[in-house]
Amino acid sequence: MKKYACIDVGGTSIKYGILKEDLTFEERCEMDTHAKKGGANILNKVINIVKNFKEKYKLEGICISTAGMVDCQSGEIIHSSSLIPNYTGTKIKETLEKEFNIPCEVENDVNCAALAEHFVGGAKGSKVSLCLTIGTGIGSAIIINDEVYHGAFGSAGEVGYMNMMGSTFQDLGASSILVKKVAAMKNIDIKDINGKYIFEKAKLGDEDCIKAIDEMVEVLGEGIA
């Protein structure tokens, strides 16, 4: 059965694994992105991940899902937010294909999530679907007739930068903002909590977490509307 190295580069963590052609994973792992160290550091992490996989498996291809605007033809990051310094211009596809001589495809992470939902998830069977992701930032993607709608300049769905209440959608409603808010309310180190922690505490009745989530949901409602 064919196997592919699949790597998702997010602003907070890099999730990676070996995906088989029956859409099941042989293995899955996760590591911190350390985004503030910049694009070169991330590319080195990706190279090392593929190198380790290549020693264990015969890889048919490399699939990269990444934060930032991506030229899906060249596999280059054409724009990245300040969350990942010096990531713009990173030639992921070219670098990996040259390093490993294995076909590589690179796409925006939200577009990848939308494709997954469209073909095997909640939007399966639909002709047109919209996927909104809420993580370190906020993004969306549009699928029309089984293909990602990229728009004239490749930026269709980049709703995170939408102006809202004197700021941007993602600077008000992303999960990273939720974490910062709860950390400040509880006077704890931001490194000690994450979104999962906050929602679990809210289920147990934590008033600070409930209040912060309510405020986040209000922002998301405004933005989606």
Residue ranges and their predicted role:
Residues 33-34, 85, 155-158:
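A short acidic/small-residue loop/turn micro-motif
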Residues 35, 39-47, 61-62, 69-128:
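Glycine-rich phosphate-binding loop and adjoining helix at the ATP-binding site
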Residues 62-68, 136, 224:
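Glycine-rich beta-strand-to-loop/alpha-helix junction loops that act as flexible
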Residues 215-225:
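Phosphate/ATP-binding catalytic cores across multiple sugar-kinase/actin-like superfamilies
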